[in-house]
Amino acid sequence: MALPVVAIVGQPNVGKSTLFNRIINQRLAIVEDKPGVTRDRNYAQAEWMGHKFDLIDTGGITWEGGKIEEEIRAQAEIAIEEADVIVMLTNVVNHVTDLDERIAHLLYRTKKPVILAVNKADNPEQRNDIYDFYSLGLGDPIPVSSSHGTGIGDLLDEIVSDFPAEKDSQANDVISFSVIGRPNVGKSSIVNKLLGEDRVIVANEEGTTRDAVDTPFTKDGVKFKVVDTAGIRRRGKVYEKTEKYSVLRAVAAIERSDVVLLVLDASTGIREQDKHVAGYAHEAGRGIIIVVNKWDLPKKNSTSAKEFEREIRAEFQYLDYAPILFVSAKTGQRLDQIPSMVKEVYDNQNQRIQSSVLNDLLLEASKLVPTPMIKGKRLRVYYMTQVSTNPPTFVVFVNDPELMHFSYERFLINQLRQNFDFAGTPIKILPRKRK
């Protein structure tokens, strides 16, 4: 299930990034930061009082300047659209500015929960100035100090209280998956076949689909939500402003998905753009299924599928965990397998392994391969525990994290895959020093 999304927005230089860093370092439950795959937006997963959420840091919003400022504002607007809860950060030192008022008006029109936070409010002499911010019409301003941490707990309490109820309820789980790929590989056709109706405009021209459309459906009693996106093009090939915006929305769709279908075109083979698309999904840590479309078109024989699969594995070595499905959106071949595969990958992403079982695995692994030694110092592995799901994330407590060579980390991941079903999902290993 996709996590609630919180976006921090505001004018330039009010302390948004400092607040972002303060929140993601607030609890040890935070696993890792994940840099935004697009410019001027950073993502991280955070947790407060048992509530996990995705946090987005944005660039400063302004309507002045040139193309750079316009791009930053476009990024912020995407974050606002993506968010379930919005934090508008202001600065008590600056008082209420015309730019604050314009941003507040923009947020008010979203009809989403907006929390007004006033930064640099740790000086008692400036507390009275906070009341001026009521004029923005966004409710009670919450005084905070991003640099010193004052008021951050109150802000987080307010944030989690505004989360949509359905996103906190396991009973209402909806498996969200996006269909991504370079233009004209047949993404919309696949979605239409899955839904049984023409919900997305389809044409032979590249970039026919301009927007991301969320569509719920149910299959065998399981609730799904499919997000179909416009094709992702290499940045150098994106000329139109609308097409550039579609690239950004496709990346946002990946962030909102549990599972990603990476669609390849069997008739054209693997292109450089396919690798860029795959990189977006892999870096986001989402479950991935590789879907080879147009399998009805090429001339093939009994070994064609194996040969194409070998090519995929060679070109996408970092996606060795992703299952491959050969389909035809035109004839409907094997498309009926997609929902069950998405459900399987989703279940694999969200499974938890008991620490006792993990430590038995560590013991057996130590008998197979010795731990690495660097500059005369050997890595000692003490125990392992799972700290997160989606993707499955494991903390390994060691004597010195610097001694954890990538090859041994890969060995541990392979051991996990051999002993448990993690098909379709990446696995993260985080070495930590035992205290």
From Swiss-Prot:
GO terms assigned for molecular function: GTP binding; ribosome binding
KH-like domain segment(s): 351-435
SUPFAM superfamilies attached to this UniProt entry: P-loop containing nucleoside triphosphate hydrolases
GO biological process: ribosome biogenesis
Swiss-Prot/TrEMBL keywords: GTP-binding, Nucleotide-binding, Repeat, Ribosome biogenesis
PROSITE patterns: G_ENGA
This protein's record includes keyword Repeat: yes
Binding site for GTP 2: 181-188, 228-232, 293-296
HAMAP family: GTPase_Der
Similarity comment: Belongs to the TRAFAC class TrmE-Era-EngA-EngB-Septin-like GTPase superfamily. EngA (Der) GTPase family.
The protein's name in its UniProt record: GTPase Der
